[in-house]
């Protein structure tokens, strides 16, 4: 007659704990030294915040993530120029903007 075992008896048997405990106690010094070397080498993991993920729902449909990212990127951009204006050029551009917005009359 064969003996039936419970799953916990096979996986969590007392022998496996004693074997692991013996290995750890014998190699305790080597284990600690390896962990400190590994800590120095490894870099921290960046975990993104959950608040940055936002989905907009229109008529029950979900917006694809690439569309959301594109919207964020374009909304965050400002108009800028690569060249810096100085002196007379800066005055001309300032006056042009003020005329276009109605703050300066022609």
UniProtKB/Swiss-Prot annotation:
Segments for region (Disordered):
1-65
**Cysteine-cysteine disulfides:** none
What switches on expression, per the entry, is described as: Induced by dark, abscisic acid (ABA) and salicylic acid (SA). Triggered by pathogen attack such as Pseudomonas syringae pv. Tomato DC3000.
Q: Which GO terms describe its biological process?
A: defense response to nematode; leaf senescence; regulation of gene expression; regulation of nematode larval development; response to abscisic acid; response to absence of light; response to bacterium; response to salicylic acid
> When this gene is knocked out, what is seen?
The s40-3a mutant, with low but constitutive S40-3 levels, exhibits a staygreen phenotype and delayed senescence associated with a reduced expression of WRKY53, SEN1 and SAG12 genes, especially at later stages of development. Reduced cyst nematodes female/male sex ratio.
Question: Has keyword Nucleus?
Answer: yes
Q: Name one GO cellular component term.
A: nucleus
Q: Where in the cell is it found?
A: Nucleus
Record field: compositional bias (Basic and acidic residues): 16-41
Q: Which domain of life is it from?
A: Eukaryota
Keyword list, A-Z? Nucleus, Plant defense
Q: Does the keyword Nucleus apply?
A: yes
Q: What family is this protein classified in?
A: Belongs to the senescence regulator S40 family.
The role this protein plays is: Regulates senescence either by modulating WRKY53 or by activating SAG12. Affects the natural variation of cyst nematodes sex ratio and susceptibility to parasitic nematodes, depending on single nucleotide polymorphism (SNPs) between cultivars.
Q: What is this protein called?
A: Protein S40-3
């Amino acid at each position: 007659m064969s003996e039936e075992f419970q799953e916990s008896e096979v996986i969590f048997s007392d022998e496996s704990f004693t074997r692991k405990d013996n290995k750890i106690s014998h190699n305790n010094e080597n284990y600690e030294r390896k962990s400190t070397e590994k800590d120095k080498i490894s870099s921290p993991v960046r975990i993104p915040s959950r608040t940055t993920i936002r989905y907009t729902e229109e008529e029950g449909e979900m917006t694809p993530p690439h569309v959301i990212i594109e919207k964020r990127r374009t909304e965050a951009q400002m108009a800028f120029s690569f060249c810096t204006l100085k002196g007379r050029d800066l005055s001309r551009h300032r006056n042009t903007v003020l005329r276009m917005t109605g703050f300066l009359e022609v």
